[in-house]
């Protein structure tokens, strides 16, 4: 069983005729993802690597039913593209756009929640259910990083994702579904909102979260564990442990407020809730072995 996407997911790629959209749509197809059509306004009738292009999601979905949307759309057009997918009835959306205006990110999240949809991103490298389907810009072909197994991964960091996931594989494990929630201040979906999906998935035996300085997503995970809303073994790695106090760095979401958001505070919360925290990526595999045997 996979989370968010699987081998039967039918994907529309919005922004498919752009350089990034065309490049990564091909890689999504090459992995086995069912990319059923693409969208670029004004370019209906074109073809991108065998993917038919339509003017809008509504027009394309009449000929090619789809249940997932992948957006390769600039930040200033992302809100409209998300709303277009929602209006067409799509409930699972992923957007890689980095720098979506804050007020529009809030509107996107509210709109998705109001209609029972889930938007992952922006500022994410994407989602992969290993061996089944991929959304975004994930280098699925690196076997030492993306091997199928029983560990779910949630990440805020694109650069740390490959490093930590490689350590999971080196430790003798593999990945069910990896979801990059993104590093912006207002992500469409937060770690704690994804935990119930991993909790319900029989193929996921443990979860690794790749967090970082700032925000409160990791503390929210600890709260879910304390409340027994998530009961599976959990290992966390947090980037920014040695960051100088008061220095601006990293993603827009790397903001410490009201004493919350520090790596020290996140670590204490996760440990108190029963999770394990790796001080460096190389410790992740050993911690999983200790928990899973």
Curated annotation (Swiss-Prot):
This is ADP-forming sulfoacetate-CoA ligase subunit SauD. Involved in the degradation of sulfoacetate. Catalyzes the CoA- and ATP-dependent conversion of sulfoacetate to sulfoacetyl-CoA and ADP. Cannot use other sulfonic and carboxylic acids, and shows only residual activity with 3-sulfopropanoate and malonic acid. It comes from the Bacteria. Coiled coil: none annotated. Signal peptide: none annotated. Its EC number is 6.2.1.-. The lineage of its organism: Bacteria, Pseudomonadati, Thermodesulfobacteriota, Desulfovibrionia, Desulfovibrionales. It is an enzyme of class 6 (ligase). The active site is at residue 251. It comes from Bilophila wadsworthia (strain 3_1_6). SMART domains: CoA_binding.
């Amino acid at each position: 069983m996979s989370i968010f996407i699987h081998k039967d997911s039918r994907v529309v790629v919005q922004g498919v005729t752009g350089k990034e959209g065309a490049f990564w749509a091909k890689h999504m197809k090459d992995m086995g993802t069912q990319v059923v059509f693409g969208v670029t306004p004004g370019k209906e009738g074109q073809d991108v690597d065998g993917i038919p292009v339509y003017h809008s999601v509504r027009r394309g979905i009449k000929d090619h039913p789809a249940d997932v949307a992948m957006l390769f759309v600039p930040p200033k057009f992302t809100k409209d593209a998300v709303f277009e997918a929602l209006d067409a009835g799509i409930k699972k959306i992923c957007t890689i756009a980095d720098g979506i205006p804050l007020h529009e990110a809030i509107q996107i999240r509210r709109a998705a929640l109001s209609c029972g949809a889930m938007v992952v991103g922006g500022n994410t490298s994407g989602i992969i259910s290993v061996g089944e389907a991929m959304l975004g810009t994930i280098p699925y072909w690196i076997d030492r990083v993306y091997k199928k197994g029983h560990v779910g991964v949630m990440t805020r960091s694109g650069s740390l994702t490959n490093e930590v996931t490689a350590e999971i594989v080196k430790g003798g494990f593999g990945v069910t579904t990896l979801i990059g929630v993104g590093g912006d201040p207002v992500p469409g979906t937060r770690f704690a909102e994804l935990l119930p999906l991993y909790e319900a998935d029989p193929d996921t035996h443990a979860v690794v979260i790749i967090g970082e300085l700032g925000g409160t997503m990791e503390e929210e995970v600890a709260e879910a564990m304390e409340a027994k809303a998530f009961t599976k073994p959990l290992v966390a790695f947090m980037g920014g442990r040695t960051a100088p106090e008061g220095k601006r760095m990293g993603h827009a979401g790397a903001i410490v407020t009201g004493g919350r958001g520090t790596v020290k505070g996140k670590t204490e919360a996760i440990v108190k809730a029963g999770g394990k925290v790796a001080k460096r990526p190389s410790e992740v595999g050993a911690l999983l072995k200790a928990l899973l045997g």
